[in-house]
Amino acid sequence: MTNTRKTHPLIKIINHSFIDLPAPSNISAWWNFGSLLGLCLIIQILTGLFLAMHYTSDTMTAFSSVTHICRDVNYGWLIRYMHANGASMFFICLFLHVGRGMYYGSYTYFETWNIGVILLFAVMATAFMGYVLPWGQMSFWGATVITNLLSAIPYIGTTLVEWIWGGFSVDXATLTRFFAFHFILPFIIVALVMVHLLFLHETGSNNPSGLISDSDKIPFHPYYTIKDILGVLLLVLTLMALVLFSPDLLGDPDNYTPANPLSTPPHIKPEWYFLFAYAILRSIPNKLGGVLALVFSILILMLFPLLHLSKQRSMMFRPLSQCVFWILVADLFTLTWIGGQPVEHPFIIIGQLASILYFAIILLILPTVSMIENKLLKW
């Protein structure tokens, strides 16, 4: 009799995705982040669901409902801080996952890659709207500043902003719709993740060498299930250490002050995971130019398959490209730092130079270096 695992219409899909899936024998720990992102998504949906049971999306009661969750709900403080810091862990895993794809040339699976970029946009939108919900000072002013950027769109800008706000300023209508979108988007993300995996399993995983590994595959279970468990343990350990020892480490103290439209905080800045994009936005003195640079800073990822001029897929055997890649990583750290600084003399020029370098590396330097390496192969 054939195993139910292999014949049952529903179970066999799970079997082909997570159990009998042929996987390359040499994928490193950098391939753990896919499963860790899945875990982060599950944690966020579950903690978010329990928070939604106690949260009220009204300007008068939103801030106090979050306080109520932390003080009066059983383990409410734990659920709230797991959700807030879970978002940070989510983005750490996301950035490492995307960085892995860039380094090892995984973007040559362009359907998988492009859906991944759409997923990145969806997660960023979800995180932004979630940050508005506690209705603290930074929530309110962050929402005001970021939604206001849409007014830079010619002709329809102002109308569009007022349509999104549901009035002439960020108010109760904005908060209610942000809560609705923040609730629905993770489920859309789950659907996109399934499509992401569907396309990935059409081709199979890439591996560090970038070479075809069809001749040397091993079953996903038990080899990579046990390997993923190590990643899960490290992720949960890090998350719980953050939640239990310094839950407000990555937050902004201004968000413990209820939203007040009459008083602007001295420095409006987003959560740490948006700072690099915020720095690029601020580095351009023109409003529309800044908005375009902001959008293009993420959208540029979609160009990676087109900009790949090397004869080799992975950077494993390309020392010059490796060097440029790590300069790009350093540049992103610099942008993140600048995004959190006030708009003053040394920071403005550093931000502008770092922004130029970011686009130059991706659009010019990496493709040029790839071509040089192709020439060196002939020597």
Swiss-Prot record:
It is a multi-pass membrane protein. The keyword Endoplasmic reticulum does not apply. A ubiquinone binds at residue 201. Binds 2 heme b groups non-covalently. One of its GO terms (cellular component) is mitochondrial inner membrane. It is found in: Mitochondrion inner membrane. Pfam families: Cytochrom_B_C, Cytochrome_B. It comes from the Eukaryota. Belongs to the cytochrome b family. The cytochrome bc1 complex contains 11 subunits: 3 respiratory subunits (MT-CYB, CYC1 and UQCRFS1), 2 core proteins (UQCRC1 and UQCRC2) and 6 low-molecular weight proteins (UQCRH/QCR6, UQCRB/QCR7, UQCRQ/QCR8, UQCR10/QCR9, UQCR11/QCR10 and a cleavage product of UQCRFS1). This cytochrome bc1 complex then forms a dimer. This is Cytochrome b. It comes from Spermophilus major. The lineage of its organism: Eukaryota, Metazoa, Chordata, Craniata, Vertebrata. The gene is MT-CYB.
